[in-house]
Amino acid sequence: MQTSKSSLAALTLGAIGVVYGDIGTSVLYAVKEVFGSGHVPFTHANVYGVLSVLFWTLTVIVSLKYVVLVLRADNHGEGGLIAMLALASQAVKDRPRLRGWLLGLGIFGTSLFYGDGVITPAISVLSAIEGLEVVSPHFGKAVIPLTLVVLFGLFAVQKRGTAGVGRYFGPVTLVWFFTIAALGVPHIVGHPEILGALSPHHALGFILGNPGISFIILGAVVLCVTGAEALYADLGHFGKRPIRLAWFSVAMPALTINYFGQGALLLAEPSAVKNPFYMMAPDWALVPLVVLATMATVIASQALITGAFSVTKQVIQLGYLPRLNIQHTSVRETGQIYLPFVNWSLFVAIVLAVVMFRNSSNLAAAYGIAVTLDMLITTVLTFFVIRYGWGYPLALCVATTGFFFVVDLAFFSSNLLKLLQGGWFPLMIGGLVFTLMMTWKRGRELLNDKLREDSIGLQDFLASVQANPPMRVDGTAVFLSAEAGVVPNALLHNLKHNKVLHRQNLFVTVRYHETPWIGLDQRLQVAPLGGDCWQVTVNYGFKNELDLPSALRLMHGRGCELETMSTSYFLSRDVVVPTIGSGMAPWREKLFAQMHHNASGVAAFLHLPSNAVVELGSKVEI
């Protein structure tokens, strides 16, 4: 029991650092942007109304939607939009048109994650360092350079992994939550009447009394739930109970106290609206607070970067992006990975955002559209999971998800007003990533169709080979093929040029499934073909670590004994040549050909030993 309690405490502390770092730093800018927009007349009633709207936004979107409902939709213990997409896809697998529509919707939502991933670190780190302007206006010119230095340092250390410093994320973020709560308490004690804003009637009164203003400021209110989707995305790392415990015992109380402390400060000192978070602190605490806030925002950004690596790897394994260079940064934790291309692409986009928008208020205009659209997509997918996957009554599913859909739609609609002020930026990034994903998926389909058209049946080919057997050499040859049952091009080229066949031959097809994990008992499907040849299908989930040699070692005892030193892997490297009238627009064909050319090699992706790989090339017109 003691071990169980200590494990729960450790997981809860970890969840505080990774899951709630982002939403925990929203106190830096949420209240400032709501009142700083100039849309809300500064009255006591409006302060109560806005605080009530902030509190009930946290309650409805985070506590009810994500913590209570969405966390239940785990896919073999895993969460995140891709896990939800896989659940929804499986739930409607007997409805192919609906399934295709949901897959497109889910992939679009995944693309938007990258748009959010650019804005969130930029606004978080920038707003933390802007605290220096409260210390002294003379620091104003240093804010952007310091922000860029911090961001560069953050991205530069990614290749070393986070195993060493990751243990401090939870404690530092816990200190942050205690600090923001401590900042709010004295101001609430000075104006305890502010706690009356906990009542929903203040939120309803504000919305009904000022419908136009309320609709507009929802675009700023949504800042209080930055990172809410991380609750679900990190489900597989921490589990439901630690995530829920961390929210209700630490994050939610600390956020509420701080927001209400900022509200109490505004009641007493309306001029504090220019930066209410930092102006809650005494002068002596400002510099340490800026340092702590910067550390907290770096941790929050780190969690998002790690999430980008993980999501990209999953999308690659689902077949929506080309293979990329994936480096493992820890010998103990297989999930700790580093993708150089993703890392530096994010960095360039974030630097561009900081330089273009200049301050956190301008970045606040860019934030919201992508994340609220993501929330809408999550709600839609949740409906199909609980209706068709869990079999709940239609009326209950519509009532539950319909309520959240209306809330999400209100926030999304409000954020559309910010489209020209900066909302276009994350949408542009998401749209670009979505175009790349769909082009790659369609291009792979066309490529596989072409290879299938030109292919020879494996059984017939082996029969002809056995009738006129070539010379056999010792060892095992592993031929990789995208399709089972057809002759791999690498085998044809090997016979053409080398005129030999190995003693044992495995024809291997790797399959990626819409489930997070596939156990070792389901890893291989083996079919003997005769003549010491086998057809092998290797199955992976989208979160499994890919290691083909390890998987093939499971062949022992199935009539095929693999010796590592005498096994060779034969791969076909297809050079794609775009042609007119293939099923894609010419520019997409050229884009696919370039993506295919730049994709990292199969050998590294499947962890094949480099000294045992033979790669043979061929041209394919699509």
UniProtKB/Swiss-Prot annotation:
It is a multi-pass membrane protein. Its main location: membrane. InterPro entries: K+_transporter, K_trans_C, K_trans_N, Kup. The keyword Ion transport applies. GO terms for cellular component: plasma membrane. It is found in: Cell inner membrane. It catalyses: K(+)(in) + H(+)(in) = K(+)(out) + H(+)(out). Keywords: Cell inner membrane, Cell membrane, Ion transport, Membrane, Potassium, Potassium transport, Symport, Transmembrane, Transmembrane helix, Transport. GO terms for molecular function: potassium ion transmembrane transporter activity; symporter activity. The chain crosses the membrane at residues 8-28, 50-70, 100-120, 137-157, 169-189, 203-223, 247-267, 285-305, 337-357, 366-386, 392-412, 419-439. The keyword Membrane applies. It comes from the Bacteria. Transport of potassium into the cell. Likely operates as a K(+):H(+) symporter. Belongs to the HAK/KUP transporter (TC 2.A.72) family. PANTHER family: LOW AFFINITY POTASSIUM TRANSPORT SYSTEM PROTEIN KUP (PTHR30540:SF79), OSMOTIC STRESS POTASSIUM TRANSPORTER (PTHR30540). This is Probable potassium transport system protein Kup. The lineage of its organism: Bacteria, Pseudomonadati, Pseudomonadota, Betaproteobacteria, Burkholderiales. The gene is kup.
